Amino acid sequence: MNNQSAKKSPTRLTYISDIIEISPYLRRLVLSGEQLANFPADQQGAYVKVLIPQPGETTVNMTLTGPNAAIKRSYTIREFDPVRGQLSLDFVINKHTGPATDWAKLANVGDTVAIAGPGPLKMNRFDFNDYLLFGDSTSINAVDALIKRLPATAKGHIIMLVNSHQEQALLSQHPLLKTHWLVLNDSITAEQQIDWLLDKLELFGDLPAVTQVFVGLEATQVRVIKQYLLEQQQLPLSSISATGYWKRNTDADTFGKQKQMQPL
């Protein structure tokens, strides 16, 4: 990372000041610390990189690059309270294993962790009349932040896949956007999830040509939704902000390399 990038994305040392169990599958870690004093306000929906220690490390690793770099994972900012200097991040747990989810599951109040960022919002157009927002448990905070930034006159639909009913409370209500929920369980297959998403799209009929879309889902779901919107709805690519938050049966490091070689 060059000096300019480092200035844009400083590394900060924090500690866990509170832990909130949102659901059996979602755990909120509230981070505090003196180095959050100059963290920029109004960053809900942006993201930070959480620097996870390498296996066997017992001290905080604040190294961003090189062979001894920390494991880096992106997490959406749920809330930043500049008065209290508290940053809230939600971690999916008990659905898979990996460095970040394993660390978050075992984390305790008082533990220290480094973060870098913030990075930008995934979507930054809030002057449209019509919106489609797709999300799941990994992107629900990004979707919530977008809802709060939309004008009250915006229309459209919010389509969410979540791991528990408790997570529904995380999403703000918008007067003119209808929310559609699918609460997942082990009996709902990956194929059935995609079928449900496509069924919803077909029920919406022809979308206005200027619809703005956010898609924050599993990688295969992102590809299917994006293809449908481009080919069946003839939406311009510039109107679609699509991000694969994770990929089924693929670890985050491998998925990151795949996205660099073949963007979604």
From Swiss-Prot:
Name of this chain's protein: Ferric siderophore reductase
Name the source's superkingdom. Answer: Bacteria
What's in the keyword line of the UniProt record?
A: FAD, Flavoprotein, Nucleotide-binding, Oxidoreductase
Among InterPro entries, the record links this protein to: FAD-bd_9_SIP, FAD-bd_FR_type, FNR_nucleotide-bd, Riboflavin_synthase-like_b-brl, SIP_C, SIP_fam
Residue ranges of domain FAD-binding FR-type in the record: 9-127
EC number(s) on file: 1.16.-.-
Q: Which GO terms describe its molecular function?
A: metal ion binding; nucleotide binding; oxidoreductase activity
Record carries keyword Nucleotide-binding: yes
Which source organism does the UniProt entry give?
Answer: Shewanella frigidimarina (strain NCIMB 400)
Using the UniProt record, name the top-level EC class of this enzyme in a single word. Answer: oxidoreductase
Q: Which family does it belong to?
A: Belongs to the SIP oxidoreductase family.
Question: What PANTHER family does the database record attribute to this sequence?
Answer: FERRIC REDUCTASE, NADPH-DEPENDENT (PTHR30157), NADPH-DEPENDENT FERRIC-CHELATE REDUCTASE (PTHR30157:SF0)
